[in-house]
UniProtKB/Swiss-Prot annotation:
Species annotation: Ruta graveolens (Common rue)
Family: Belongs to the thiolase-like superfamily. Chalcone/stilbene synthases family.
GO molecular function: naringenin-chalcone synthase activity
Protein name: Chalcone synthase 2
Transferase recorded as keyword: yes
Signal peptide range: none
Role of this protein: The primary product of this enzyme is 4,2',4',6'-tetrahydroxychalcone (also termed naringenin-chalcone or chalcone) which can under specific conditions spontaneously isomerize into naringenin.
Active site: C166
Catalytic activity as recorded in UniProt: (E)-4-coumaroyl-CoA + 3 malonyl-CoA + 3 H(+) = 2',4,4',6'-tetrahydroxychalcone + 3 CO2 + 4 CoA
Keyword match Acyltransferase: yes
Length: 393
């Protein structure tokens, strides 16, 4: 019998078709705060009510945030038990770590269970796990903890992504696409879980970018199942992952930084982040959609990481986008705040549900092609080209 060639083995290993998102699940902590009440609560719990001018500034930030509510694991009771977390820069990493190494995998599990249920296959068919968080670091990591919590096979192939920040919702889809398309039969469980216990701290008039984070960030976890060549009798593709790219924007050093210190994760950003993104976004779009022959940005559906309202406003203006293009993005920002890596997966979920409710022809607001954008530290941009699927076809 002739020996099998490496080329033949390679061909047999690969999937035939493109990777697709097969299911989505999301979860939040039970506790939430309303943005209208948050400035009073925040300055009270951090014992900063004497900083009246700063409080007024923070109120204006919250008013402009376009956020209605945010979910937060940190309750008033937890914060009262951990006064160092409420101070501006007090050593508190141990207390923060003790919370997130337990709660980040737990919240991830809630989202994963929902995604697995929608997928409809036994969890033993999950071949790969990608876990992503910017909330805490530990060994073995959240990927290991989630494997145990869900009862996945010990041979599941795990990837753990720590400290990537807000662009990572795009990164995990890019990685999942490569895994699914290069390993025939692979089913990749992707989980992004974020808890603001690492970044919460009291106010300081010398560090206003920290206050911006306190006004925007919320907690949430999202999970997706990604696979190629779906079993159409059970699996229902939601979005095909057509291409994925990552780039560092020019002249953006130091635009968004986070540093893990004894005081927790500190957050720093330049004022011109919205300008840097809006100035460079069309280049990423042209590179992604040129091969497909698309140059009208209103002819595609949009899943954009909602870093904050200023980013969305400037992107909209720069590209001449119609108001409804960022509806799903703004809806998630309003109801959850900025949940870092989990946001774009929440927006995918919001869009496919709304499309089904409204009787749209496809999961992409009736359109065929779409883009998913992640923006974050670097300044790094992830661009994922999506193709929607017909609803009830």
């Amino acid at each position: 019998m002739a020996a099998v060639t490496v080329e033949e083995i390679r061909k047999a290993q690969r999937a035939d078709g493109p990777a697709a998102v097969l299911a989505i699940g999301t979860a939040t902590p039970a506790n939430y705060v309303t943005q209208a009440d948050y400035p009073d609560y925040y300055f009270r719990i951090t014992k900063s009510e004497h900083m009246t001018e700063l409080k007024e500034k923070f109120k204006r930030m919250c008013d402009k945030s376009m956020i209605r509510k945010r979910y937060m694991y940190l309750t008033e009771d937890i914060l009262k038990e951990n006064p160092n977390m409420c101070a501006y820069m007090a050593p508190s990493l141990d207390a923060r770590q003790d919370i997130v190494v337990v709660e980040v995998p737990k919240l991830g599990k809630e989202a994963a269970v929902k995604a697995i249920k929608e997928w409809g296959q036994p969890k033993s068919k999950i071949t790969h796990l990608i876990f992503c968080t910017t909330s805490g670091v530990d060994m073995p990591g959240c990927d290991y903890q989630l494997t145990k919590l869900l009862g996945l096979r010990p041979s599941v192939k795990r990837f753990m992504m720590y400290q990537q920040g807000c662009f990572a919702g795009g990164t995990v889809l890019r990685l999942a696409k490569d895994l699914a398309e290069n390993n025939r039969g692979a089913r990749v469980l992707v989980v992004c879980s974020e808890i603001t216990a690492v970044t919460f701290r009291g106010p300081a008039d010398t560090h206003l970018d920290s206050l911006v984070g306190q006004a925007l960030f919320g907690d949430g976890a999202a999970a997706v199942i990604v696979g190629a060549d779906p079993n159409e009798s059970i699996e229902r593709p939601l979005y095909q992952l057509v291409s994925a790219a990552q780039t560092i924007l020019p002249d953006s050093d130091g635009a968004i930084d986070g540093h893990l210190r004894e005081v927790g994760l500190t957050f720093h950003l330049l004022k011109d982040v919205p300008g840097l993104i809006s100035k460079n976004i069309e280049k990423s779009l042209k590179e992604a959609f040129g091969p497909i022959g698309i140059s009208d940005w209103n002819s595609i559906f949009w899943i954009a990481h909602p870093g904050g309202p200023a980013i969305l406003d400037q992107v909209e203006a720069k590209l001449g986008l119609k108001e409804e293009k960022l509806r799903a993005t703004r809806q998630v920002l309003s109801e959850y705040g900025n949940m870092s890596s989990a946001c774009v997966l929440f927006i995918l979920d919001e869009m496919r549900k709304k499309c089904a409710e409204e009787g749209r022809a496809t999961t992409g607001e009736g359109l065929d092609w779409g883009v998913l954008f992640g923006f974050g530290p670097g300044l790094t941009v992830e661009t994922v080209v999506l193709r929607s699927v017909p609803i009830n076809a």
